[in-house]
Structure formats: C-alpha cells, structure tokens
C-alpha cells in the first residue's frame, strides 16, 4: 500500500500551525516541533529534540531530509507551517511526480515577487536586512557563499525555486543524494535554502 504524508515544521514558535481545509483519504498530516504544548485535531504532533542552537536549522533538517524522518512513506509534500491544504494533494502528485522524484514551484512564476536568480535573491536578503535591521542570516556568510558559486562559474538568472512547498518521492536514490547535498550546504553555509538547491540541480544536469 502506498503511503503518503503532508508534513510541516514549527520550531521556536516561528509559525502558528494552520489546520488543513481539506483532509483527503489516504494521507497523514505530521508536524515536527519543539513545542510540547502544540495541539491539533488534524495534524499528528511529533515532539522532537533540537540539534542546533538555531531554530531555523532545527526546522530545516526535517524539511530537507524526509528520507531520514519519514522513511515509511512513499510520497511526501512539505508545506511551510503557516500554509494549509485546500485541495486534493493527489492532484499535485499526479501532475508533478509522474516523471520526476522531486518538484518545486518556480519563484519566477510568483506574480507579486518574481525572481530567477540566486544572486538577486541574496541581494533581496541584504536589502531586507538593511531596511528592517534584522538579517535572515549572516550577510558575510551569504556573500562568501555567493562568491564561491560565482568563482565556480555558476551563471546568473539560472532559475530560483520557492521552498514553501516541496513534492518528493523521498526514498528514491537520486532524491536522497540531492537532499543530503542540500542539507550539507545549509548546515555549513547559509541557512537560506532557496540560495542553494537550484545550483545543485544545475550541477547534476
């Protein structure tokens, strides 16, 4: 029997868990969290220990590595903690995972904020930090990482994913390799995951 899961992560009280508007047959809903008081009627709350002094990385290891934490499932859909399911997720699986083991949404299709470049994404992060006095990550770390990619010849305007929703056959070998590489970049460099994955995908083509 094929097992399917929608999952999310909430660490450090960053998001308020949103109940799904639609609960399809054959799907489980799991939330990984460090919050012992988090409750839900629809989500299975999985309280887990933290591994880092960084709530973002604590959350992203579950986001990026479902093969480690959800190996009993064949298909997974990750959604950000502030998002909800409104329609049948089987349609997403049928539309996007028939010929691929992983699928993301294209940031350049975002009508309000289209972007297609990791270097532009880094600039937006810098501008946001300057404007608000609160950087989403160490700007010097991001600058160093982007310089490394430039030195390796990674081109501008080569695409950008949005990481709010990820569809995966996460136990497939190529998906596991990609996710482990993605996690290595996040673990040792910037935690801004959108800066990394499209570059890794480019290297595998």
Feature locations, PLM:
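Residues that flank catalytic or metal-binding motifs in active/ligand-binding sites
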Residues: 2, 25, 63, 79, ...
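Catalytic core and acceptor-binding pocket of nucleotide-sugar-dependent glycosyltransferases
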Residues: 129-205
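Conserved donor-nucleotide/metal-binding helix-loop-beta segment in metal-dependent transferases, i.e.
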Residues: 85-125
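Short acidic (Asp/Glu) patches
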Residues: 57-65, 91-92, 141-150
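Short aromatic/hydrophobic "clamp" motif used to bind/position activated sugar donors
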Residues: 76
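The conserved acidic donor/metal-binding loop of glycosyltransferases
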Residues: 80-84
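N-terminal anchoring/stem segment of glycosyltransferases
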Residues: 1-60, 69-73, 188-191, 203-205
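A short acidic, amphipathic alpha-helical/loop segment
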Residues: 18-20, 66, 89-95
